[in-house]
């Protein structure tokens, strides 16, 4: 696929001035920036604009391009890297900052209330516990407000002071020279770490952080029907908020141990039931285990291995309360590894007959049951 003309990419004529090239580049880079643009091919267009600017903003590269086209532009310097810096030491982070950071944007109050961080806790349940639900008392490490300083971080009897370097704003102005001129950016004040306040005398308990590490016991109700990998949100049981903000949430991630007999698919429970050849061929009534207790299941004569039977309502309850799953029983014939002489003779007799009568089926059934 041939490359587009660099002037066309920037929407300029070949006689465009350096300032016109810079303005066109800034406008298009902002338009197609991947963090801002919602267009499907924004990344490709952004790279195309960046490549065009890299060539046309350099007098030597531009002269080669004007004379030889793309072949001349690619001679004497490496191909476009896509993720590197812009020409002239002006980086990707700088251009983004000049567009969306700086003095024109809304500044967040460093002392405004902020929600605390969310926490995650892993819990492992038995198969039946996940089916029927459970109530747990879990102990988690959290950061709570310091009782000594009431979360201020300052020694009792003292208070925080306004930072003189940023006048309490938590931000300072930094000037930067760029190809587009001098730009003023705002960044967090290094003296107060962006808080706008200085603690002269720190609390000896929390050392100025305003928080202490504790282990907190929390009651968690596991709903019936929860499945492996699902999580429960316990509102307000995460880390404490900042500056009086609300606490975060606790997310309890559930893991379910495998069962030796049952498997689970959504709200349904699957199991395999081993049966003898005689039971499959002649039919029988068997007891099938379920998580709700044993139930009777009728096996029709002539049932094939792999046949699936449904036990309605014997699965797991839906975790959101939308009904109950079923249990599916898959029957498998178990081929005996040791046969008596009588059993072998009867099987040979069975295999040699075109049509089997009831008397032969009766003999087979009694033989395999040891009667």
Curated annotation (Swiss-Prot):
Report the cofactor remark: Binds 2 Zn(2+) ions per monomer.
A Pfam family recorded for this sequence: DnaJ
Q: Whose protein is this, by species?
A: Bacillus cereus (strain B4264)
Q: What is this protein called?
A: Chaperone protein DnaJ
What Gene Ontology molecular-function terms does this entry list? ATP binding; heat shock protein binding; unfolded protein binding; zinc ion binding
Q: Which taxonomic lineage is given here?
A: Bacteria, Bacillati, Bacillota, Bacilli, Bacillales
Q: Do you know which SUPFAM superfamilies this protein is assigned to?
A: Chaperone J-domain, DnaJ/Hsp40 cysteine-rich domain, HSP40/DnaJ peptide-binding domain
How is the quaternary structure described? Homodimer.
PROSITE patterns registered for this protein in UniProt: DNAJ_1 (PS00636), DNAJ_2 (PS50076), ZF_CR (PS51188)
């Amino acid at each position: 696929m041939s490359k587009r003309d660099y002037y066309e990419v920037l929407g300029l004529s070949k006689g465009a001035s350096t300032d016109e090239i810079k303005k066109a580049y800034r406008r298009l880079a902002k338009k197609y920036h991947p963090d801002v643009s919602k267009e499907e091919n924004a990344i490709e267009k952004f790279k195309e604009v960046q490549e065009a600017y890299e060539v046309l903003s350099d007098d030597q590269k531009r002269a080669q391009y004007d004379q030889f086209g793309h072949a001349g532009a690619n001679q004497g310097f490496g191909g476009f890297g896509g993720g590197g810096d812009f020409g002239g030491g002006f980086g990707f982070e700088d251009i983004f900052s000049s567009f969306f950071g700086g003095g024109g944007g809304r500044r967040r109050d460093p002392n405004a209330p902020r929600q605390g961080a969310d926490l995650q806790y892993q819990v492992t349940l038995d198969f039946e516990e996940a089916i029927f639900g459970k109530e747990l008392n879990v102990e988690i490490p959290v950061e709570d407000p310091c009782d000594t300083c009431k979360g201020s971080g300052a020694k009792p009897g003292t208070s925080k002071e306004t930072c003189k370097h940023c006048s309490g704003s938590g931000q300072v102005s930094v000037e930067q020279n760029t190809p587009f001129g001098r730009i003023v950016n705002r960044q967090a004040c290094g003296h107060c770490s962006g808080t706008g306040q200085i603690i002269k005398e720190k609390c000896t308990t929390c050392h100025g952080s305003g928080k202490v590490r504790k282990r907190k016991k929390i009651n968690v109700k596991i709903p019936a029907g929860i499945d492996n990998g699902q999580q429960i949100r316990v509102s307000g049981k995460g880390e404490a908020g900042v500056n009086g903000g609300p606490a975060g949430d606790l997310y309890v991630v559930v893991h379910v141990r495998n069962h030796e007999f049952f498997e689970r698919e959504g709200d349904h429970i699957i199991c395999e039931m081993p049966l003898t050849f005689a039971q499959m061929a002649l039919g029988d009534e068997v007891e099938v285990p379920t998580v709700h207790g044993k139930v009777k299941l009728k096996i029709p004569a002539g049932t094939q291995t792999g046949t699936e039977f449904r036990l309605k309502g014997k699965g797991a309850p839906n975790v959101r309360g939308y009904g109950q799953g079923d249990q599916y029983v898959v029957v498998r014939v178990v081929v005996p590894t040791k046969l008596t002489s009588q059993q072998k003779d009867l099987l040979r007799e069975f295999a040699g007959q075109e049509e089997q009568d009831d008397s032969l089926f009766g003999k087979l059934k009694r033989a395999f049951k040891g009667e």
